[in-house]
Amino acid sequence: DAQRRKIDRLLDEANVGPGTRLLEIGTGWGELAIRAAARGADVRSLTLSERQVHLARKRVAAAGMSDRVQIDLRDFRDAGGNYDAVISVEMIEAIGLHAWPEYFRTIDQLLRPDGRFVMQAITMPHDRMLASHKTHTWIQKYIFPAGLIPSTTAISEITSRHTAMRTVNTMSLRADYAETLRLWREQFLQRRRTLSHMGFDEVFSRMWELYLAYSEAGFRSGYLDVYQWTFAREAQQP
């Protein structure tokens, strides 16, 4: 239910409804595309994961939404077309610092003049982002290769410099994310024996438990945050 409420707020912020032409950057497992299609939107969703394409298409078909949802194995830079709304959930953290301007420029070009872009992004303080982007931590080595968590300052500066999009509003989900990580870790530990039968060894299990606990501590302490962030063209701001 919490995940569905999160998705519904993203769709609300993007003004997704009947006839909306929606582009999703980062398919996940297809839930956002399905819920958007249930509102009457026409959805195109992009991912670089063949596994996500296969499972998301299967879930879309099971939901009876194949006529409204197109899932493509494609880089966002090659999306093409024009859209009423673009939504991207925790994608920016994975593409690296040097790709951020191109990411926002591409989205700006894909949006129709009255369109909205809504993203969910994990953030860290700007000084820590600057200090960490040239380091190579264990998380970058084992969990998110080449990834970097942005700061709110970086996001604002890049969108102002490289696009016509401006912030409409932001909403922090930090406390909810910390609790989510606690529950993920709890579920992971309860199923640890099952995971070993799936081929995940003890080294991986300890690393993943540490990653979940480390991340939870980051959100609870305020070192990390997570925002749903809504952008519109300057003339479209309320």
Regions found by a protein language model. Name each.
Residues 56-57:
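Conserved SAM-binding loop
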Residues 77-87:
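A short acidic, Gly/Pro-enriched loop at the edge of an enzyme's catalytic core
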Residues 29-40:
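Conserved SAM-binding loop of SAM-dependent methyltransferases across substrates and taxa
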Residues 42-47:
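Conserved SAM-binding motif I beta-strand of class I
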Residues 114-122:
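Conserved beta-strand signature within the Rossmann-like core of class I S-adenosyl-L-methionine
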Residues 18-26:
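Conserved class I S-adenosyl-L-methionine
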Residues 101-113:
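A short glycine-rich, Lys/Arg-flanked "PGG" loop and its adjoining helix->strand segment in the class I
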Residues 123-238:
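Substrate-binding/catalytic lobe of Class I Rossmann-like enzymes that use SAM or dcSAM, i.e.
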